[in-house]
Amino acid sequence: MFEYIKGIFVGFNKDYIVLDNNGMGYRIYTSGSTMAKMPKTNETVLLYIKQIVREDFIGLYGFLTKDEIEMFSLVISINGVGSKAGLSLLSICSVTNLKYAIVSGDEKTLI
């Protein structure tokens, strides 16, 4: 449904950031690697967005690069891997390293 959101970076919490877009604050869950690359407070940023809707939860997940959101989508499509596990994996492993681990069958990295 959403491709991206562009807005003012307001701040962050443990596992999400807040982005202001036209006076509306969006809670966007993201990886540690994206959080580490966020601009200074009150600066404009563009995040690629994936909306996840479950019976008990609706959430936005955002990333600075298309590669990272595509990897997140791929990882959470695996049976038994949820959005929290996907964010955790992307927080400790770069997209490049994850691609290599998948192609080479490196189970240690993937576990």
Predicted regions, residues:
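Long, highly charged, low-complexity intrinsically disordered interaction regions
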Residues: 6, 10-111
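Short coil-to-beta-strand transition motifs
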Residues: 1-5
